[in-house]
Swiss-Prot record:
InterPro entries: DUF350. Keywords: Cell membrane, Membrane, Transmembrane, Transmembrane helix. It holds the Pfam family DUF350. This is UPF0719 transmembrane protein YshE. The chain crosses the membrane at residues 10-30, 48-68, 78-98, 114-134. Coiled coil: none annotated. GO terms for cellular component: plasma membrane.
Length: 134
C-alpha cells in the first residue's frame, strides 16, 4: 500500500486536491473579510471585483506552486500554503490601511476598475515575494 502513495500520479492528485480545497477555504475567508459578496458581484458583471478576486486566486495558486515545489510532504505544503495565505491577507489589510482617502472595498464594490486592477497587481505581485521566501 505504501507504493500507492509514492506513485507520482497519486502525489500530483493529492497535491492538486489539497491545494484546491485550501483555495476554496481561503476564498471563503476573503469573502468574510470583504464588505461585498464576491460571487454575487461577479455574477452582476462587476469587473473590479472579478479582477480583485482573480488576483487573490492567482496569488494563492502561486504560493501553493512554490510550496509544492519546495517541500516533500502534504503537511509541509499545507503549512507553508497557510502561512503564505496569511501573508497575503495581511497585505490586503495593509492596502486598505495605506489608502485612507477612500475605502478599498467600497471602491471595488462600486466597480472602480482602477482599484480592482491595483488590488489584482498587489495580490499577484506580493505572492511572488511570499513564494520566494517559501
Amino acid at each position: 500500500m505504501s507504493d500507492f502513495w509514492e506513485n507520482e500520479l497519486v502525489e500530483i492528485a493529492a497535491y492538486y486536491s489539497v491545494a484546491v480545497l485550501c483555495l476554496v477555504l481561503f476564498l471563503t475567508v476573503f469573502e468574510l473579510v470583504t464588505a461585498y459578496k464576491n460571487w454575487e458581484e461577479i455574477q452582476k458583471g462587476n469587473l473590479a471585483v472579478a479582477m480583485a478576486t482573480g488576483g487573490k486566486i492567482l496569488g494563492i495558486a502561486n504560493v501553493f506552486q512554490h510550496s509544492i515545489s519546495q517541500h516533500n510532504s502534504l503537511l509541509q505544503m499545507i503549512g507553508w500554503g497557510v502561512y503564505g495565505f496569511v501573508m497575503l491577507l495581511i497585505s490586503y489589510f495593509i492596502f486598505e490601511f495605506l489608502t485612507p482617502r477612500f475605502k478599498i472595498d467600497q471602491e471595488i464594490e462600486n466597480d472602480n476598475r482602477a482599484v480592482g486592477f491595483i488590488s489584482f497587481v498587489i495580490s499577484v505581485g506580493l505572492s511572488f515575494v511570499v513564494a520566494a521566501g517559501i
